[in-house]
Amino acid sequence: MNVLIINAGSSSLKYQLMNPETGDVAAKGLCERIYIDGRLTHKVGDKKVVKDIPMPTHSEAISAVLDILVDPVEGVIKSVDEIDAVGHRVLHGGMEFSDSCIINDEVIKAIEKCIPLGPLHNPANLMGIRACQAVMPNTPQVAVFDTAFHMTMPPKAYRYAIPKEYYENDDIRRYGFHGTSHKYVAKRTAELVGKKEFKMVNCHLGNGSSLSAIKDGKCMDTSMGLSPLAGVPMGTRSGDIDACVVQFICNKYNMSVDDCLTMLNKKSGMLALSGVSSDFRDLGEGAEKGNEDCVLALEKFSYEVAKYVGAYAAALNGIDVLTFTAGVGENDGLVRAMVCDYLGFMGVKLDPELNKCRGKEMVISTPDSKVQVWVVPTNEELMIAQDTAELVNAAKK
């Protein structure tokens, strides 16, 4: 089975053609500068092709993707008919969606309804969906929501302590993000430890970071909130702050709320603390050279991640497994060690040699650690492909 995975941005579109059963990627690439001029970067194995192709809209971008997939020289399939389904990443499903679903007119209307909750991403995701429908009208399309995995949270975790009408009228609550990644890691960890019923905290640590408290494969709590700004500090996001900080800055510097939120999203986090970079590799190098601001950034990040792990361990009444995933979680042994240094009270013990691993699926705790600590590389595209295949195959029965 071939599933085409689409992640549409406002002026870009990422794609992969994948076998959901094996995880093999036949081809992948990126369309960028949509609406401006258009450029396609297409990869098959180690071979990369870059083409300038006019892309006035997302429809032309999708057409360019399909053309190169069936190209006699650069392609990997003979006909578009060999694509069995399309899986779309959709950022915000609001309270409308608790799982992936086959796209129809009602689903599109519901995604449109969620635009106020995901004003930057949902319109772009819809453009990708409509573009695929236009050029592949007979191919099943599936929406996979970044928020869906977290919809199993209980009210005590997702409700904000603000007047009830804002929840009832405007759906203001904790939603959480990176759900497809958390779902994949939870599923894969269950396979690795050989059981379905256990308690874990997954640390998705990258330029954007979030944690999820998971019991028996279901999310009980997560660190991001109504938006991806909440939780631990990130590459350029502040993470949790006192809401009055916004009022103070806006009043003192005559700044609009929108401009203040842009600052909190794009000019804060590790970039602001270090004054150097949002890239954790740069922070590590700076810390080694004695840059105190880089040291502080790493200490702040590790401290906040550990605080969330401890809080979620309390919420779950203990945990069996702690997992690290995404760019920093998979590759940065220093950050993992700094986080776990705080967790000795839980019986967490890292093996220093095993913790040197980068991007490999493996246990990094000692045999006598009371909590198993794993590195589990995420694969959101595979999760999207598997969800898509499962829904499409079920619909055929």
Which residue stretches match the model-derived regions?
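Adenine-nucleotide phosphate-binding core of ATP-dependent small-molecule kinases
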Residues: T262, G269-L273, F280-A315
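Short glycine-rich, Thr/Ser-proximal phosphate-binding strand/loop in the N-terminal lobe
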Residues: V3, S12-P56, G225
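Internal helix-turn-beta structural module
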Residues: V295, E299-N317, G329-K397
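Short beta-strand-loop/turn "lid" adjacent to the catalytic site in phosphate-handling enzymes
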Residues: L69, V73-H121, V142, F149-A157
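Phosphate/pyrophosphate-binding loops at sites that engage ATP/ADP/AMP, CoA/4′-phosphopantetheine
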Residues: I68-I83, T189-G194, V309-D320
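Glycine-rich phosphate-binding loop of actin/hexokinase-like ATP-binding domains
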Residues: F149-K252
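Catalytic phosphate/nucleotide-handling subdomain of diverse soluble enzymes
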Residues: K215, M220-S256, T262, A326-C357
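Glycine-rich beta-strand-to-loop/alpha-helix junction loops that act as flexible
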Residues: A8-G9, R89-L91, L205-N207, T323-N331
